[in-house]
Amino acid sequence: MRGGWTVGVPRFAILSAFDFREPAMTQSAALSYRDVELAAERLLGAAHRTPVLTSTTANKLSGGTLFFKCENYQRMGAFKFRGAYNAIAKFDDAQRAAGVLTFSSGNHAQAIALSAKLAGIKSTIIMPQDAPALKVKATKEYGGEVITYDRYTENREEIGRRLSEERGMTLIPPYDHPDVIAGQGTAAKELFEEVGELDILLVCLGGGGLLAGCALAARALSPNCKVIGVEPEAGNDGQQSLRKGEIVHIAVPKTIADGAMVTHIGEHNFDVIRRAVDDIVTVSDTQLVQTMAFFAERMKMLVEPTGCLAAAAALHGVVDVKGKRVGILISGGNVDLSRFAELMQTLDA
């Protein structure tokens, strides 16, 4: 296959396609595939061009021809590096001097901490007390200052806004930001460049950054491709939102997909999703564990529960892919080995 790996010295450019201080709706209205292309230019030499893998077994199980875009092999183990790096690469001198702040359950936390380290700036990360130990440890090792909160009783967005005002740091949320969306879309851009047009694109859905960015790429590079988001059954706020035509808020969902434990889709994200996404479906936690086992046994890959969302929809028949060319975004592979073993044992229960 074309593509493979591209690793190089990071280059941070000061660009001004968006002003972080502009009103949100002004920014999202301007978001287009051109922003994904510009993000790809900034990421060149910094992000891995992750491999696209296939599996004869997966094709037999699903009846389709599946192409797995493996962002579990991205820097820090997830697609989140793309959006975080793209956002920080656009900081002006004042923003760089003050540093960056975010809130995240894990992967965006690591992505911001690593991108900030590469840029030579400070980072403060607000993480839930029950975040996976592996993700907390990696965030600290990348140089991020970690502040914890209770995800069930405290509001991370309020904490983030308060700290941003107190410290003067730029807040880059995990998904509701135009530069984050544009960066995430580069994963689908690479996929289409490698395999050509597709019939269906399945994308993991939490807050909507990856889905929105990939939808922008799909509409430009494969106009007839059906774009489908996949979220956990316990957290189907995205599905409800798309059907109602407005953002639906839910309680914090209880699911093993910790990267999708969000209460609502972001505004920037939904602005794109309602225009460019065809459907949103859900999968069960059991299906996620079974898909994790499939990746480990058949494709020799370690994939976290959230990273299995899109693949689970194809492998378990939630989306009919028979006779179709299907792109599948594997969003990440950051799972504690002890947690992985624990989840595998549930299959024998």
What are the functions of these language-model segments?
Residues 11-24:
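Short, Lys/Arg-enriched N-terminal segments with co-localized hydrophobic residues
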Residues 21, 25-349:
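PLP-dependent amino-acid enzyme catalytic core
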